[in-house]
Amino acid sequence: MQRNFRKTFVGKVVSDKMDKTITVIVDIYKKDPLYGKRVKQSKKFHVHDENQEAKPGDLVNFMETRPLSKTKRFRLFKILSHAKSAK
């Protein structure tokens, strides 16, 4: 299987407390079938971060990979933007 066919997602890092693992939340907007209103749904993913470079608040791009642990099936592909540090 080529890497080009793997699913990619964009999400926001909410936690980096685990070793080489970040938790990313992805927001998806779906249309309600009855009323037609757009409803926001969120899902959390555990993502492998080999170099531990992503921090909470960062916007990241991640992709599918082979199972790395019981809960990790994704790996960090690119950091799109860094979080603004609070001073």
Swiss-Prot record:
One annotated GO biological process: translation
Keyword Transport in annotation: no
UniProt KW Manganese keyword: no
GO cellular component labels: cytosolic small ribosomal subunit
Disulfide bonds: none
CDD domains documented for this protein: Ribosomal_uS17
InterPro entries from the UniProt entry: NA-bd_OB-fold, Ribosomal_uS17, Ribosomal_uS17_bact/chlr
Pfam families cross-referenced by the UniProt entry: Ribosomal_S17
UniProt GO MF annotations: rRNA binding; structural constituent of ribosome
Keyword tags: Ribonucleoprotein, Ribosomal protein, RNA-binding, rRNA-binding
Similarity field: Belongs to the universal ribosomal protein uS17 family.
HAMAP family: Ribosomal_uS17_B
Function, as annotated: One of the primary rRNA binding proteins, it binds specifically to the 5'-end of 16S ribosomal RNA.
Assembly and interaction partners: Part of the 30S ribosomal subunit.
NCBIfam families hit by this protein: PRK05610.1, uS17_bact
Name of this protein: Small ribosomal subunit protein uS17
Protein's organism: Onion yellows phytoplasma (strain OY-M)
Gene name of the record: rpsQ
